[in-house]
Amino acid sequence: ASDDSAADDSAADGSVFKIGSIGPTTGDAAIYGNAVMNAAQMAVDEINAAGGANGYQLAFNAEDDQNDAEKSVNAYNSLKDWGMQILMGTVTTTPCVAVADKTAEDGMFEITPSASSTDVITNDNVFQACFTDPNQGTASAQYIADNNLGTKVAVIYDSSSVYSSGIEATFVEEAQNKGLEVV
């Protein structure tokens, strides 16, 4: 976990806004979590160096969920205990779906930068900053058809991955709608 110490110093007078984040910083999906956490920490540091946001310094605390739903819920509870006021995350879909129900129960605002399944946004308090899986599959098939890049296409995907399967399903559907032959 990372905290911005300058922001923590201002917490005593109530002028700090606490941002929590959850994502894989270790394990097979760490490349995604580390990219998000590093970018968020850079943004917090830049905002704080420029005087903060509307009179508030930002504190950022990132928790590792190892791309595991149960660990993600535990991380969420830890961040709540820390005093988190907004959740940026989680980074990957399965943990995000698990945490979204908890944030809905608590009325916590949640925005995911990268969990792309439509299952993520079933609660009114959860938002996606990225495109959804169906958008990716549909747009890819449309691009191939609209730019005459071929009439026969093959799809290679990981059937054990919710992310990959979601894109594949909408790609195949749109490819067929566009007259492409999926082999």
Residue ranges, per PLM feature:
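Beta-alpha junction/loop-to-helix N-cap segments that form part of ligand/metal-binding clefts
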Residues: 16, 31-36, 50-119
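Second-shell loop/turn segments in exported
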Residues: 25-31, 62-65, 84-86, 124-130, ...
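Short, low-complexity disordered leader/linker segments with a strong preference
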Residues: 1-18, 49
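Short, polar/charged alpha-helical segment
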Residues: 31-54, 169-176
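Short, well-ordered beta-strand elements
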Residues: 15-24, 58-62, 152-155
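An alpha-beta-alpha
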Residues: 126-183
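Amphipathic, non-transmembrane alpha-helical secondary structure
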Residues: 41, 70-80, 97, 138-146, ...
